[in-house]
């Protein structure tokens, strides 16, 4: 199993180009099922999850080529099924449900691995599709959905759900009549999907707000689209500059998507300047301890919680971090404590007391963002840190070790434990 070996203590200096957003690319790829023909996407990151979605679409009959452009031809869809062997590795696979049902009238999609419907937002997808006229049954771990043609409805989400908003918005594009979605997610990735659907001929208004209105059309046509920059990757590298006392310029990013993150990182003592597609960050003073609470966009994102916690481990006081989106999203805490962090957990709260330094140690990544938090802590720690199970990183960070090495990090990938 591959691992990262990091010798910390080097301030990062230089330029990092931010990749396209995985969380924008995946729903765009699912949207290709809505229209027969060739869809073309640029700025698509080369990540494990992108490869998995290509395999899933390929299983259905679509063909894909990922060079400088990701081309998907959905003209030969024949298998209206998302099998467990593919869905189990990526929860975003459920995004094919709405498009398949809307265009073909049938979908058989495996429940994501370990998913208890009552406790996970997938129930919001299913109840919304039922309100649009779908007949849905659960059979042997699969969602089986049928509808001659979906019909418009007014749907109020009990909780803000990004993938639920995306799934029902896609389904509504081909439904009969008007669909009104209320309490919708406002994330930039939702807006990007709506932008592409409009290029395909969809009639959508209100994306970026808490109410989206979709007037169904008879047919959509393929188009081209550039994937928006990854705001979480950008936030991660800003935090990396902060925790190492470095100076970085980030290019190919969208500062407007990072306002809540930048506000908190400035409060933590970082000097951050923004321009068109650019963020300049410098850290040359003490890290100030700052409290955060995660909440849906435009508030502080849960996907930056772990990385911010790493920064706070070296703060000059006490930071209270409250996770309000997901349960059990403090799995990185035990590993950070192995590096010398002083953190106490109390339910959804983490109390982080800043320490003078972290010390390298063997640690294990538990999920995507936890992996990034361990990399940041290792970059600042004295001595050598070895991080195992780094396949999590490959789900969401394109060439992270290469990008960090280019700005001065002493980092190397050790293949197969050799």
UniProtKB/Swiss-Prot annotation:
InterPro entries: Enolpyruvate_Tfrase_dom, Enolpyruvate_Tfrase_sf, MurA_subfamily, RNA3'P_cycl/enolpyr_Trfase_a/b, UDP_GlcNAc_COvinyl_MurA. Pathway: Cell wall biogenesis; peptidoglycan biosynthesis. UDP-N-acetyl-alpha-D-glucosamine binds at residues 91, 303, 325. The keyword Glycoprotein does not apply. Gene3D superfamilies: Enolpyruvate transferase domain. Its main location: cytoplasm. HAMAP family: MurA. Belongs to the EPSP synthase family. MurA subfamily. This is UDP-N-acetylglucosamine 1-carboxyvinyltransferase. The gene is murA.
């Amino acid at each position: 199993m591959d691992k990262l070996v990091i010798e910390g203590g080097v301030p990062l200096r230089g330029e990092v180009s931010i990749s396209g957003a995985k969380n924008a690319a995946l729903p765009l790829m699912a949207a290709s099922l809505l229209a027969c023909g060739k869809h073309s996407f640029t700025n698509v990151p080369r990540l494990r999850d992108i490869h998995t979605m290509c395999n899933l679409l390929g299983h259905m009959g679509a063909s894909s080529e990922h060079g400088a452009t990701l081309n998907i031809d959905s003209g030969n869809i024949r298998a209206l099924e998302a099998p467990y062997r593919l869905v189990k590795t990526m929860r975003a696979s459920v995004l094919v449900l709405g498009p398949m049902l809307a265009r073909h009238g049938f979908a058989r999609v495996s429940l994501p691995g370990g998913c208890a419907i009552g406790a996970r937002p997938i129930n919001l997808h299913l109840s919304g599709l039922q309100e649009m006229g779908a007949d849905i049954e659960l059979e042997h771990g699969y969602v089986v959905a049928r509808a001659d043609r979906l019909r418009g409805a007014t749907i109020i989400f009990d909780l803000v759900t990004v993938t639920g908003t995306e799934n029902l918005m896609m389904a509504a594009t081909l439904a009969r009549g008007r669909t009104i979605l209320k309490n919708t997610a406002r994330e930039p990735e939702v807006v990007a999907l709506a932008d592409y659907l409009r290029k395909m001929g969809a009639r959508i208004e209100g994306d970026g707000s808490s109410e989206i209105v979709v007037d169904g059309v008879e047919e959509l046509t393929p188009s081209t689209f550039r994937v928006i920059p990854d705001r979480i990757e950008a936030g991660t590298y800003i935090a990396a500059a902060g925790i190492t006392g470095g100076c970085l310029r980030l290019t190919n990013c969208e500062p407007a998507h990072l306002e809540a993150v930048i506000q908190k990182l400035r409060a933590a003592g970082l000097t951050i300047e923004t321009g068109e597609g650019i963020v300049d960050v410098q850290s040359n003073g003490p890290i100030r301890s700052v409290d955060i609470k995660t909440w849906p966009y435009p508030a502080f994102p849960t996907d930056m919680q772990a990385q911010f916690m790493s920064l706070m481990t070296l703060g000059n006081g006490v930071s209270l971090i409250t996770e309000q989106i997901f349960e059990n999203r403090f799995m990185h805490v035990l590993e950070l404590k192995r590096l010398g962090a002083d953190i106490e957990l109390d339910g959804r709260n983490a109390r982080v007391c800043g320490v003078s330094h972290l010390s390298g140690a063997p640690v294990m990544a538990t999920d995507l963002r936890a992996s990034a938090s361990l990399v940041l802590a290792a970059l600042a720690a004295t001595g050598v840190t070895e991080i195992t199970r780094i396949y999590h990183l490959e789900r969401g960070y394109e060439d992270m070790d290469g990008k960090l090495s280019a700005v001065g990090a002493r980092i190397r990938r050790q293949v197969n434990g050799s």
